[in-house]
From Swiss-Prot:
PROSITE patterns: ATPASE_E1_E2. Gene3D superfamilies: 1.20.5.170, Calcium-transporting ATPase, cytoplasmic domain N (3.40.1110.10), Calcium-transporting ATPase, cytoplasmic transduction domain A (2.70.150.10), Calcium-transporting ATPase, transmembrane domain (1.20.1110.10), HAD superfamily/HAD-like (3.40.50.1000). It comes from Arabidopsis thaliana (Mouse-ear cress). Mg(2+) binds at D746, D750. Residues 1-157, 218-345, 414-801, 853-872, 930-947, 1002-1025 are cytoplasmic. The lineage of its organism: Eukaryota, Viridiplantae, Streptophyta, Embryophyta, Tracheophyta. The gene is ACA11. GO terms for molecular function: ATP binding; ATP hydrolysis activity; calmodulin binding; metal ion binding; P-type calcium transporter activity. It holds the Pfam family E1-E2_ATPase. It is an enzyme of class 7 (translocase). It is found in: Membrane. This is Putative calcium-transporting ATPase 11, plasma membrane-type. Belongs to the cation transport ATPase (P-type) (TC 3.A.3) family. Type IIB subfamily. Its EC number is 7.2.2.10. GO terms for biological process: defense response to bacterium; monoatomic anion homeostasis; negative regulation of programmed cell death.
Amino acid sequence: MSNLLKDFEVASKNPSLEARQRWRSSVGLVKNRARRFRMISNLDKLAENEKKRCQIQEKIRVVFYVQKAAFQFIDAGARPEYKLTDEVKKAGFYVEADELASMVRNHDTKSLTKIGGPEGIAQKVSVSLAEGVRSSELHIREKIYGENRYTEKPARSFLTFVWEALQDITLIILMVCAVVSIGVGVATEGFPKGMYDGTGILLSIILVVMVTAISDYKQSLQFRDLDREKKKIIIQVTRDGSRQEVSIHDLVVGDVVHLSIGDQVPADGIFISGYNLEIDESSLSGESEPSHVNKEKPFLLSGTKVQNGSAKMLVTTVGMRTEWGKLMDTLSEGGEDETPLQVKLNGVATIIGKIGLGFAVLTFVVLCIRFVVEKATAGSITEWSSEDALTLLDYFAIAVTIIVVAVPEGLPLAVTLSLAFAMKQLMSDRALVRHLAACETMGSSTCICTDKTGTLTTNHMVVNKVWICENIKERQEENFQLNLSEQVKNILIQAIFQNTGSEVVKDKEGKTQILGSPTERAILEFGLLLGGDVDTQRREHKILKIEPFNSDKKKMSVLTSHSGGKVRAFCKGASEIVLKMCEKVVDSNGESVPLSEEKIASISDVIEGFASEALRTLCLVYTDLDEAPRGDLPNGGYTLVAVVGIKDPVRPGVREAVQTCQAAGITVRMVTGDNISTAKAIAKECGILTAGGVAIEGSDFRNLPPHEMRAILPKIQVMARSLPLDKHTLVNNLRKMGEVVAVTGDGTNDAPALHEADIGLAMGIAGTEVAKENADVIIMDDNFATIVNVAKWGRAVYINIQKFVQFQLTVNVVALIINFVSACITGSAPLTAVQLLWVNMIMDTLGALALATEPPNEGLMKRQPIGRTASFITRAMWRNIIGQSIYQLIVLGILNFAGKQILNLNGPDSTIVLNTIIFNSFVFCQVFNEVNSREIEKINVFEGMFKSWVFVAVMTATVGFQVIIVEFLGAFASTVPLSWQHWLLCILIGSVSMILAVGLKCIPVESNRHHDGYELLPSGPSDSA
């Protein structure tokens, strides 16, 4: 099978267009192309979207480079005049929405200057740049200037899915057969008897179509909900005089938005103020170089990303008037990329479908030949009646129905169903799966490279210890007793409040609230405990320049001017890095004294001591300058003020989650920017760093020769002081060694590693929009235990699909062979078209619902990972498929060829009674085998069964409908009511398959590291549900 599937391989992430086109061209037999490829990407649409995107990007380039220059020379009178409408005037505004949109879209600096810059626009939209929009005005602003929402494609109706299900070519052929059968039947047998066969087929087709459409419609609603969740972005704005967080969809014209590294620009707008703002416009214009935005070039476009710096912007245009909104409106949905499992199972379906087509043709040919031979023997070869035509039509319907049963198109669709179910459950468990393949791939992961802060720890940081003036002070509940001189205290408060990117605001109840990163919040809270006041500090100093924190420099700097005209630079960051920038230290009198080698060594010991207690350490430093530097702020000559130790407690349950991963064969590696002592202390507390494990610094790792790096990689459990490039190198090399790597990230610089990994996991709280966009899964609560839950559900998806494949292939084999052999030997098929359609629904839609939606049990995380190279259909599965198929073929074969004698069936209705028994026994074999398929290797198949209400409901419905078909729908399904003895016999024949399953599972099959994920029998421990 593996050799046959060589054309059905795609990369687990970002598959090439050529690979997708190759495997689709390999799918030679497709019953319903629209349905089979509906839940995955539409290659034509993707190509069309790319073409449109390029055209729009080219137009935007023209705007940037031609129109921008042209406006320098165009007379203002030639520009379009925008007349102010009464509605706008009545609302208290003095500028039209289209005028604002045109100004920003065309980068019309002349019009902006004429209006009066950001301040002038603020006046025209009746907003204060300091206070922001008033909440009471939101409704009127949305009414006049629009909402910040893009036009959504209308949801497809249920009838669309019904129509799609009807596109199945084999069902269409059967409908034609049914209509002809009704016509011929009524002509020969009269009304209503002549309608039964054809009407039975039509009713079966309607049932199949409705169940299929309902299943697909529910899936589409789930994906639509998930898509809406993906588009939720929280941004920071100033409203009612305070900084607050709002949804991107609640943004209005006039809002003052705060932007920082990694943010998405949420609407079109104008730069108000900021520092070193660089914007990545590649998603909009295609330009790879970042654009520098400042007061001279103040225009910001929706959909672009903040690559560096920070700023405040005034929103001028929202929703469909923005350039991004127009782009989104132009592009149609292209759908999801295929998951590797979908591709592989499409291959399996195609190969089996071709085999089934061969069997169907052979069955039809054999039945026709036997019929012709019988007529020739009877001497009536030249005499043909409408009854003969009806017989041939029945033969053709049986052949077509064999194709319906033979092509297991439910295989790839079961993957979608299972993934959709898992994605919905994970959503309630605080994990948003952005790409289908991620959930599937996560089940195969062999290692997780995780951040520390916020993922392993709570991200609720507090300053726990501080070193200042050669003394270590520890936090006593909510207070610090530092006993500092006024001069030292003032310098420390300055170093805290001047060098921050966060805000201290009052909430509606008047309580102090700190908005910003957890580290910033901890330091500002420390400053407030010292009695500092943010507003006072901001009034006394003017910020001249900011160099924001990033993962490479591991420090943040700010340049300020005092009221007296002095220029002072403040810096804070990783202790061992910032300490090297210091030449002096503040003494107890607030004076700067030289920093000797001995003192540096002493301070380094303090830092090491803090770190060994799992405290994050930061140095706060400053330096006075004669004048403001033109370029970057200095990297030396600073005076050390204090070393703070920040406590970030380990999350409850993380140690247990790490142990779960280790039991599951998943290696957990911690990759952090903290120093190695802090990293090791946290890693030991979490259970990550074990005996024999290696903790290494990023600088040492990146300088290793290739052969040494390969040798040490399997042992690395902690990487400290790492750069984003180190994380990318680690992930890349682990993948080269055959590992399936999941990696977490929250910063903009983590994007390459998230993109490189098999599964990128972005943090929902601490993560930037750039990180989220490059991730496959967003961990909404930033919790490591949630990551483990994603892995558990990924394994459940993989194993559930294995169960379904085992079940469906068994039905395929038996249905094909029993009808073919019977046709060859007896000249008739025991299973009619209506019966085969019912069997098809049992094994396709209902089987997928029952087996592909089983929730995970704890035992899944006690098994080795599947890995990258495992065969999907394992030896254990083949053993079960072959064993069950042989049993069913033997039993049904005996009934078919000797059933009348064994059961002592006589009389004119003996044949239909026997065929009903065969059909009923066949269905009950599948019912019991579906229960068997809940476990591939474990004997106890009932464990946790009643916790899966979907499975129980499907089993109950299947048995209930089978009783109705046999007892009450005989005219349509070619069955007759059975005696209780015959019912007992059918159930007994089906139940024997469960005893057989126990025996089969005791037959050892060769195992390897990457088996199907189940404990080997009989020694495997029992799972707890």
